[in-house]
Amino acid sequence: MSNIQTGAERMPHDLSHLGFLAGQIGRLITISTTPVIAGDSFEMDAVGALRLSPLRRGLAIDSTVDIFTFYVPHRHVYGEQWIKFMKDGVNATPLPTVNTTGYIDHAAFLGTINPDTNKIPKHLFQGYLNIYNNYFKAPWMPDRTEANPNELNQDDARYGFRCCHLKNIWTAPLPPETELSRQMTTSTTSIDIMGLQAAYANLHTDQERDYFMQRYHDVISSFGGKTSYDADNRPLLVMRSNLWASGYDVDGTDQTSLGQFSGRVQQTYKHSVPRFFVPEHGTMFTLALVRFPPTATKEIQYLNAKGALTYTDIAGDPVLYGNLPPREISMKDVFRSGDSSKKFKIAEGQWYRYAPSYVSPAYHLLEGFPFIQEPPSGDLQERVLIRHHDYDQCFQSVQLLQWNSQVKFNVTVYRNLPTTRDSIMTS
């Protein structure tokens, strides 16, 4: 009689682990990955402390910290290859890998050490790309489609991809293809009233898709329906935690530093994922993003920079603001020394929906504060994405990059897996 083990009791497995993390402002970095099996139940309580590197001056602005946990099924990455792989079982062709470069830190954005083989599983890299493309780039930006990590620039491979600034008038413009006008061909002697209404309807549905429905699930929700994350191979956001990292100023205590002070930021946090049932094999990604509010030294309120104001500019007339097309302005309209050739589009009246931060000119010549010193340049995408080098001058040292965190991931997974003893005692 054979005593081959053909199953296992569902038991809790403690997958708790530590993380000693370092990252850059505005870049999305993976801080933990857990492979999961169909039928698992995954739960996590992460407890840690986040620190900014020592500041050169007193603490001026709190930073905002976002921590996310996503579930990415392997089928979303490998497609039909995964289905065939599972059907073929032990006779299946091994799953593909992707290539990294030879540096130890060129897979750090995925939360792993780069192996000696310079190859990592495809689902790690493609899973990260899927998360970034669906949740962290502006919808009008092109998807990141690199096939291998060795195609990335060094900053992306080490620190993660650049993310958008927190929203304001110049960091969250309308899509660049936004129409400022639309022509309708008519007869020279008459206007087709019904055709005019049809043109309005076409414009309305086009604008809805341009601004609010660039993804399939958004389109379906506009009809009153609902799609699962599986419909468009979208990673499932399981949990998000948001906090503001604050700190304190430290006064000098010895003779050489007496009277001097510098900022220190240490913020404890907790990120809890309630028990989540895993429907099929995949990976649980936990990622972190630290950002300063976009505070620019030369930013000006739009009405103050415009000069002679028209009725439309200043009246706040709801009839006009509700019916006028978007307005195209330039960086010069919201920044001193801004480039008038760098255009972007905003909704009419947007200057009444937003107030810029003000930085006294006394700060302008001082380094050490988390301010954007010069008007952002480059194309629209370059201006919207955070440049972490803008903040290098804030820190005394960046040996542990611009922020670091020490965290305990308390992870419990309930899964059907033989015990270690059962695996040792083969048959």
UniProtKB/Swiss-Prot annotation:
Organism: Enterobacteria phage phiX174 (Isolate Sanger)
Any one GO molecular function term: structural molecule activity
Protein's name in the database: Capsid protein F
Known function: Assembles to form an icosahedral capsid with a T=1 symmetry, about 30 nm in diameter, and consisting of 60 capsid proteins F. Upon virus binding to host cell, one of the spikes dissociates from the capsid and the virus interacts with LPS through the exposed EF loops on the F proteins. After the genome had been ejected, the channel formed by the F proteins at the unique fivefold axis remains open.
GO biological process entries: symbiont entry into host cell
UniProt xrefs under Gene3D superfamilies: Microviridae F protein
Superkingdom of origin organism: Viruses
Record GO cellular component, one term: T=1 icosahedral viral capsid
UniProt keyword terms in alphabetical order: Capsid protein, T=1 icosahedral capsid protein, Viral genome ejection through host cell envelope, Viral penetration into host cytoplasm, Virion, Virus entry into host cell
Subunit structure: Pentamerizes and interacts with H protein, G and B pentamers to form 12S pre-assembly complex. By binding with protein D, induces joining of twelve 12S complex to form the procapsid. The procapsid has an external scaffold made of 240 copies of protein D, 60 copies of the internally located B protein, and contains 60 copies of each of the viral structural proteins F and G. Upon genome packaging, interacts with protein J. The mature virion is composed of 60 copies each of the F, G, and J proteins, and 12 copies of the H protein.
Compartment list: Virion
UniProt similarity note: Belongs to the microviridae F protein family.
